[in-house]
Amino acid sequence: SDLIIVPDENKARQWVEASHFFGEKVQYIPAKDPLFYTADVHGNAIARDRMLAIKKIVDDKCGTFVMTIDAVMDQVVPLSDIKNHKMTFKMGETLEEATIAEEFVARGYEKAPFVEAPGEFAVRGGIIDIFPYTQESPYRIELWGDEIDSIRSFDKESQRSIEEVDALTIYPASEIILNQPRIEHGLRNMEEDYEKLSQKFKKEKKYDQEARLRKEMDRVREELRELHMLIGVEGYLPYFYENTECILDYFPEESMIYMDEPKHIRERADAFYLEFSESMKSRLEGGYLLPKQANTVTDYESILYQIEKHKMLCYSILSAEINDFRVARTLFMDTKSIQSYNNSFEQLVKDLTKYQSKD
């Protein structure tokens, strides 16, 4: 697998659209929004797109991915943790219906009366419905006693079966796995930081900040202990995992990294990191978050170190603008910008004829 790094989302979309012309689709891996983890109305769509890409990487399917530098700077869980929490169900195997809901919830799935959207599951009387993030349709697992009797995809509207399969692999609906040991581990780390920061606010007579922090911590405790989930869990990543990774760790060293306009990437990375750091500092001082929540983004110098472990190709309109890397070879290409034809087929034909006559 190869990775294209771009300065912004518009550039990423251009790569995806252009890839259709060449027959091989470039897959977009969106950034998590570290400044607004709890306010992202597109959260499920982002989580699903990211998990689809991660599945492709885990399955070792060759492909090309594109990411903004913001997305590359997001800290992520070790890839091994996602691999270890895939679930595979096979015909004839046994399944504990009593505990399956707990397993799904730990992997980020939401219990519902009926499955209607990706990320939901339902359990009732020997029937388990689940809509994996990595599938186009929900699946129904029917039990005979505690043995899997059938596995089939179905239409969520009509409930009619689409296809029967012998096995089904389900990827998590969240990159952070919240099983009971990890919940306890995360809470211990949070309580430790909470006590220190709470005492600091009290000592400095910052009672509003202390009350705000206490309210947030109460919410976190309640959601984790009662619901076994946490809204905005990505913002608490360092509390649940001692060692986080950069998404570049997901790509083998033989992967090629393409940098589209390195100067613009550097400018965006520096601006993003500054914006993130200032926002986190302000929120920390205001009692809106815990200290380690400010450590969910990797600085650009560390990203460069990771990039240099791979083979690399940089594209820049001005060659003098590549300063972050030692250039081993330079290739110059003559290109021309073209006008927008606005559905004027006649003008397109004229221009093509003119270009052909010059050859």
Task: Locate the predicted segments by residue.
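ASCE RecA-like P-loop NTPase motor cores
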Residues: 1-359
